[in-house]
Amino acid sequence: AETQYPSAATCRTCHPKQYNEWAVSQHSYSQLSPAYLSLSNKILQLSNGTNGDFCLRCHSPVGANLGENPRMSNLKRHPTSREGITCMVCHRINKRYNKVSGRLDLEEGSLLKPVYGPLGNAEMERVLNNKDKYRVVTEEGEAGRQIHISSKGFNHLSSSSFCGSCHDGTLFNGFRLE
């Protein structure tokens, strides 16, 4: 799964400040939280499993996209799945969804694939135009620090409706989660 959905630890190499902020955030613990795990298991029990991957889709989008069973132990999950809402969960989405289901259309791919964000490509171009200075590479197997081939503009990433895909959840019985 690292080649499909790179780990946040991989992103840390170039983005230590952002990684450190994420590492102490609720996003990094979303799949590991004992409160979440208890509630998710209870909901699955009360719904006789018909709730499916509803909780997993937001708490571990990578796990949901990998098809992991919602009842699977975290010990058996892929390490990137255990990271919860990791860097690629937000930066590998390139279209508006505007639905509150957590069904995120994550683009799969290695670290070399493009990422998306509100700032676009200016900084990435500066680094790519100075590959030797920054010792970065954009080809599999090249010696050096791998970097995305581009960063594409996606202003929706900084909108509340983007976050609302998960942060505006309601259970099947109408109970509002947030």
Model-derived regions, located:
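Sequence context of c-type cytochrome heme-c attachment sites
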Residues: 1-83, 95-158, 164-178
